[in-house]
Amino acid sequence: MNVTFTKVRIELGPSQIGGIGVFAVISFRENEYLAAGIAKTDYKHLVRWTEIARIDGDIKDKIRHFCIGTPSGFIPPDKLDFNRLTVEWYINHSCDGNVGFNEDGDFVARRKIEKGEELTYDYALAESNPRFRMECNCGSAGCRGVITGNDWKDPEFREKNLDYMLPRLRRVSEAGRFAGAKPVRAVARRR
């Protein structure tokens, strides 16, 4: 019997940013495919925000920590099963992330990534829930301090990140179908 395993490219490990993170097992070139993105596997359902009242507390915590929000609802994991989270769900946020999305919604390298480096992406590349707000712990030089579901609407943010935004947000941005664009403000970080 001849058994062939898929080459290991990424793995979980302890993170300085958020407890657990995803790390490169090999080096990646700019725009190189890293892993299947959330758009392909997890956009099968949209759970409306009105449904959240019927969901138990443990699941609500998982939704808050793992799911991407939209103005209408959130995108749950495949088969609505938080016991089946893939490695990619553990990619931490950084305002200067080294990962983005390609036109198919897969994770790709935004720049050269060295073996052993933590993979991070700016959650504003995917998050569009206008009520989303997260204090940032990334520590990058360009840290915005607070990440919101409206950051993607900022013209400067879009200019810098459009090619790496989740395809759904990229299409909305290119068509100009959003209102209330406000500049992203840098917030002084507490030390």
What are these language model-derived features?
Residues 93-191:
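C-terminal SET catalytic tail plus cysteine-rich post-SET Zn-binding segment of SAM-dependent SET-domain
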Residues 2-99:
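Catalytic cores of histone-lysine modification enzymes
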